Each structure stands twice: as structure tokens, then as C-alpha cells.
Amino acid sequence: MNKIEYFNKEIEYIKDGNNKEDIKALINILPDYFFEIPASSTGKYHPKFASTNHGLLKHTKVAVRIAHELLANDSIGSKFSDNEKDLIIMALILHDGFKSGDPKEEYTRFDHPLIISKHIMENAKKLKMGTDDMRKLCSMIESHMG
């Protein structure tokens, strides 16, 4: 499975070359189940299209597309630097990365944003981004569940 190919379009939204390389490295640490499972086992928090096989992937791609369109609109996007926009897109690609835990469990782990954040920090030496950007990225992801 070439995990990066699933996100070719979304990676193109990222402007900085180093950020593109970093998101590719981080996509490669996502578990295989991320690309196969529904976004929700109950349908309670996600639309019907995301409750099928590959639903989590679909949910993620839709979230990224909506963010990209919002950030392209000057009324919203002008408030963010290009680097901040890159980090937002990256956070959305990764936000549910370990939704079922590590290793995979039957149900959603409430702390799944903390799990992916931990994996990002553990892979810091493989990334080109600085500590401040890594903290921002992890903070965005960690706040996903409130």
C-alpha cells in the first residue's frame, strides 16, 4: 500500500516543500487500518458516506478540502500565514490517524489525538520542521476532541 498516493491532491495544497516532505513522512506512519475503516462505527458523529469502508479516509479528505477552500477565501485565509495554512492542512490530514488506537482496538479511542501527537514527536528527527512548528501541529491535533 502506497499511503502517500491516497493524499496526492491534499499534499498539493501545502505550499512549502519541507512541509510537503514532512507530511509524506507522517502519512507513512499511519496504521494500515486508517485507510480501511469507517469514520464511525455507529454513524453518530459522521455523515453516511463516512460510515462505509474507507470512510475515515473519505472523512479526512473532505475535512481537508473544506479547510483548503476556507483558507483560500481572503475573509478567512488572510488571517493566516502560508506556513500556518500548511500546518492546518497537515493537522487535518493527521487528526484521526490513530483513531482506533495503537495497536488497533475495536472502538474509537477518545485520546486518539494524543496518540498521533506522540507519534509525531517520536519521529521528530525524521522531520524538517522546527520545534515551534511541531508544537503548533501537535497542539492543533490534540485540540481535536476539545
Language model: regions and residue ranges:
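Acidic/His-rich, divalent-metal-binding segments that scaffold phosphate/diphosphate chemistry
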Residues: 1-104
